[in-house]
């Protein structure tokens, strides 16, 4: 089985600057530990966050044609030394569902997704998939058809957000998917600030990389 872990980084946020080498080494060492190729993309034709987020889905589609298992992790995701082999734990399209409530920053994503589905006469859930960590393969990306359905998503919601769009597509077209356990996308933010042993991959939303487990 061929495997790849890929990520991408642009210096759009100076909070990363002094930790770039540390993060890359942690991600690369995790990939090598479990026999996966590691790829860090630094696209020079992208200069904004939205295009960077779109690019990771397009890259996943490309890699799914070349590798049996594809894992994307944001560059603010740091694997812990005790993290087991994720490739033995997940399969197909696997993402972590968040359940934002009113007043939370993520809540607006949920509302956009629900409005898109409602406009198509579809039922909807109360979650949004976080794409900071996701696993996929050729079959799951072929079913998702993200690139093919991008124009449809933009017509329904011109304000681009990759998590809104991918959540809409999964629900609208009933794409097969799996829920990624929280331990693989252990989000650190204003609610959970300090990394701990519960997480295998610590996702530093708050960018406080000096906080280590």
Which residues fall in each region the model found?
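GT-A fold catalytic core of metal-dependent nucleotide-sugar glycosyltransferases
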Residues: 52-109
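Short catalytic/ligand-binding loop motif for oxyanion handling, primarily in non-cytosolic enzymes
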Residues: 14-15, 46-49, 79-82, 86-88, ...
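Conserved catalytic core of nucleotide-sugar-dependent glycosyltransferases
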Residues: 84-153
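Catalytic core and acceptor-binding pocket of nucleotide-sugar-dependent glycosyltransferases
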Residues: 126-213
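N-terminal anchoring/stem segment of glycosyltransferases
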Residues: 1-67, 155, 159, 172-174, ...
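Short, surface-exposed amphipathic charged segments that create phosphate/polyanion-binding patches used
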Residues: 54-56, 107-113, 193-200
């Amino acid at each position: 089985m061929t495997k790849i872990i890929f990520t991408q980084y642009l210096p759009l946020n100076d909070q990363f600057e002094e930790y770039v080498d540390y993060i890359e080494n942690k991600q690369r060492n995790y990939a090598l530990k479990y026999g996966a190729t590691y790829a860090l993309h630094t696209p020079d034709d992208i200069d904004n966050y939205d295009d960077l987020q779109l690019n990771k889905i397009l890259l996943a589609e490309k890699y799914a044609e070349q590798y049996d298992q594809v894992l994307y992790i944001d560059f603010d995701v740091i694997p812990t030394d005790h993290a087991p082999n994720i490739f033995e734990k997940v399969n197909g399209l696997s993402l972590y569902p968040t359940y934002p409530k009113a007043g939370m920053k993520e809540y607006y994503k949920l509302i956009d997704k629900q409005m898109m589905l409602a406009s198509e006469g579809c039922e909807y859930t109360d979650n949004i998939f976080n794409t900071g960590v996701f696993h996929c393969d050729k079959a799951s990306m072929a079913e998702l058809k993200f690139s093919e359905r991008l124009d449809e998503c933009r017509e329904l919601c011109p304000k681009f957000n990759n998590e809104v769009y991918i959540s809409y597509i999964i629900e609208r077209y009933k794409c097969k998917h799996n829920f990624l356990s929280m331990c693989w996308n252990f989000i650190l933010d204003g609610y959970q600030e300090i990394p701990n042993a519960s997480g295998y991959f610590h996702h530093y939303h708050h960018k406080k990389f000096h906080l280590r487990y």
